Amino acid sequence: MAWSPLFLTLITHCAGSWAQSVLTQPPSVSEAPRQRVTISCSGSSSNIGNNAVNWYQQLPGKAPKLLIYYDDLLPSGVSDRFSGSKSGTSASLAISGLQSEDEADYYCAAWDDSLNG
């Protein structure tokens, strides 16, 4: 049985009602099943550099689900195939042992201090 590439779609996080993009993700990433993929999220000192990063997974037709909180913590019930990390003004979500059900939209999110006031 031949494996077809798994296609994970990523969408850039938009902050606030202004829909101002403050975090940058690649538009998409793909990898074969059972492999590992890393999704990057770049920001600045006012968001990722100074605040916690959360990651969300949105399956087609479903509400977003929290995958990672406070940079690298897994909520109860989330597979340990998912892991988060942060360094400076960048964060990453890694998914190991890719499965077909991982095909989804993935969002990174962090508060941006410049939006205060």
Swiss-Prot record:
Stretches that traverse the bilayer: none
Residue numbers spanned by region Complementarity-determining-1: 45-52
Location of region: Framework-3: 73-108
Record's keyword terms, sorted: Adaptive immunity, Cell membrane, Disulfide bond, Immunity, Immunoglobulin, Immunoglobulin domain, Membrane, Secreted, Signal
GO biological process, one term: adaptive immune response
Signal peptide from the UniProt entry: 1-19
Subcellular location: Secreted; Cell membrane
InterPro entries membership: Ig-like_dom, Ig-like_dom_sf, Ig-like_fold, Ig_V-set, IgV_Light_Chain
Function according to Swiss-Prot or TrEMBL: V region of the variable domain of immunoglobulin light chains that participates in the antigen recognition. Immunoglobulins, also known as antibodies, are membrane-bound or secreted glycoproteins produced by B lymphocytes. In the recognition phase of humoral immunity, the membrane-bound immunoglobulins serve as receptors which, upon binding of a specific antigen, trigger the clonal expansion and differentiation of B lymphocytes into immunoglobulins-secreting plasma cells.
Subunit structure: Immunoglobulins are composed of two identical heavy chains and two identical light chains; disulfide-linked.
PANTHER family associated with the record: IMMUNOGLOBULIN LIGHT CHAIN
The name this protein goes by in its record: Immunoglobulin lambda variable 1-36
Gene from which the chain derives: IGLV1-36
